[in-house]
Structures are given as C-alpha cells and as structure tokens.
Amino acid sequence: LAPRAVRQLLVRLLDIMLAFPDLLLALLAITVLGRGPENTLLAVGLAGIAGYARLVRAQVLQVRLSGYVQHAVALGEPPMVIILRHIVPNTLRPLLVLATVGIGYSILSASALSFLGLGVTPPTAEWGALLSEGRNFLDSAPWVSLLPASVVALSVIAITLLGRRVQTLIAKGGIA
C-alpha cells in the first residue's frame, strides 16, 4: 500500500524498537511525557506496539499470498472486500492471543513504573505504588505489600489463562 521506501523505513524503526526492552522504552517515554495515569498507559502502550505491528505485518503478508486470497483476486473481488473478508479476520486471530499476553505484561510494566516512582503519582492508588510504600513495613506488617503483590500476580495469571483459553478456542475454530 505504501511506497517501498516508507515500508522499509517503518520496518527498520520497528526493528530498532524491538532491539530495546519494552520497560526501557516505557521509561524513556515517561521521561518525555511526564508522570500520570494517562501518560503511564501511553508509555507502556507505545513501548509494546512494535511487537504488535510486526505480527500484523507478518500475518498480512502471509494471508495475502494464501490460495484463497489469490482466488478472490482472480475472481475479481474488490480489494476492500478481500481486506475485510479474508485478511482482517485472519490477522485478528493471532493478534487477539498476543493481546491477552500483552495485557498481563502491561499490568506488570505499569506496576513496575509506579513502584519506581515514575508512573501514577500518589494519592492515586496503583498496585506498584502500594508495593513501594509497603516495602518500608515488610518487617512489621508484610501484608501491606502482600495484598497488592497478590492482586498483581492473580491479575496477570487470570489474563494469561484467558489468553490460553482464547488460543484453544481459536485452534478449535470456536472463534471466527
């Protein structure tokens, strides 16, 4: 769709982003954007977008060369129909599975940023900030840190289990 030079530039930019850990990119984005809930979410999202973009690109290239898309082109279907009927649904399936894993990773990243004091600022309650505040009381009141740590862990486990279930449903053909 885009000229070749633009595509190559975007692919190289994605490669550069993938060369760095997501948390490091999120730290960089937080320093540029500033602290706050919206900026934390934006930083975590921007840091992880390269993986999604590469997956979508690879899926589109693979589906575009598949037999059923080639048949649709040969039959004269309009490009928009081919995109909406064949390419988008077959690209969304693996993206949905990756998104469930990404949500768990985003929860951990946002909590880590807040734990370091770079995410959401007090008095807003955030799991990482609660963990950071509770570490001063680990000797006398360990439950202060245990509760937010448990909630973070349980949330990530629940999202991961949901992702596995979605992957199983997709493999069985239960999700279109």
Spans of features found by a protein language model:
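A short glycine-centered flexible hinge/capping loop motif at secondary-structure junctions
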Residues: 1-3, 75-77, 121, 173
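Non-cytoplasmic
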Residues: 23-28, 36-45, 95-130
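A hydrophobic alpha-helix feature that marks transmembrane segments and, especially
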Residues: 1, 54-61, 156-165
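Hydrophobic alpha-helical interface/terminus motif in multipass membrane transporters
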Residues: 29, 56, 69-72, 112-116, ...
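Interhelical loop and adjacent transmembrane-helix boundary motif
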Residues: 122-148
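C-terminal transmembrane helix and the adjacent membrane-cytosol boundary/short C-terminal tail
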Residues: 33, 37, 44-47, 93, ...
